[in-house]
Curated annotation (Swiss-Prot):
Residues 61-71, 118-137 are lumenal. Ubiquitously expressed. The modification Phosphoserine is found at S3. One of its GO terms (cellular component) is endoplasmic reticulum. Residues 1-39, 93-96, 159-183 are cytoplasmic. Keywords: Disease variant, Endoplasmic reticulum, Immunity, Membrane, Phosphoprotein, Protein transport, Transmembrane, Transmembrane helix, Transport. This is Protein jagunal homolog 1. GO terms for biological process: defense response to fungus; endoplasmic reticulum organization; exocytosis; granulocyte colony-stimulating factor signaling pathway; insulin metabolic process; insulin secretion; negative regulation of insulin secretion involved in cellular response to glucose stimulus; neutrophil differentiation. It is linked to Neutropenia, severe congenital 6, autosomal recessive: A disorder of hematopoiesis characterized by maturation arrest of granulopoiesis at the level of promyelocytes with peripheral blood absolute neutrophil counts below 0.5 x 10(9)/l and early onset of severe bacterial infections. Interacts with COPA, COPB2 and COPG2.
Length: 183
């Protein structure tokens, strides 16, 4: 764009946008955290579906007990762990703080608590396996307690990160609502 003062008018070279075109940090964080939580929810869904498949095969006796062991007691309440994830997903479209808080509280009850109970329930079998080398439950020829401890460790990590990101998202949403109230 040419002008009488010279080849280009001041401020029209495209470098004047930086002071105007900025997305507030809490909005950027909100988008990033929602994406991370969604990824963790999908990983949780895969773990949950594998657990449902294992329990279904065990209860419906599709395979012998030598191939797939009967479920441990902690696996039944852990099936409810899908509810906090669904509440979390429902909270995203309109930044619903109450759904996110409910999701975090129910995650402790339906996800973390059964995993803690599961680690205590399987500990004697794991101790016997590693001291004496004897396993009594199997999953496709492998020790069921070893495989289930791996699943348990993975699930604890997924839920811990999910809680961490949910707390950060909640803080981000509170920041944006506080700024709206001050205006």
């Amino acid at each position: 764009m040419a002008s009488r003062a010279g080849p280009r008018a001041a401020g029209t070279d495209g470098s004047d946008f930086q002071h105007r075109e900025r997305v507030a940090m809490h909005y950027q964080m909100s988008v990033t955290l929602k994406y991370e939580i969604k990824k963790l929810i999908y990983v949780h869904l895969v773990i949950w579906l594998l657990l449902v498949a294992k329990m279904s095969v065990g209860h419906l006796r599709l395979l012998s007990h030598d191939q797939v062991a009967m479920p441990y007691q902690w696996e039944y309440p852990y099936l409810l762990s899908i509810l906090p994830s669904l509440l979390g997903l429902l909270s995203f479209p309109r930044n619903n703080i109450s759904y996110l808080v409910l999701s975090m509280i129910s995650m402790g009850l339906f996800s973390i608590a059964p995993l803690i109970y599961g680690s205590m329930e399987m500990f004697p079998a794991a101790q016997q396996l590693y001291r004496h080398g004897k396993a009594y439950r199997f999953l496709f020829g492998f020790s069921a307690v070893s495989i289930m401890y791996l699943v348990l460790v993975l699930a604890v990590q997924v839920h811990a990160w999910q809680l961490y990101y949910s707390k950060k998202l909640l803080d981000s949403w509170f920041t944006s609502t506080q700024e709206k109230k001050h205006k």
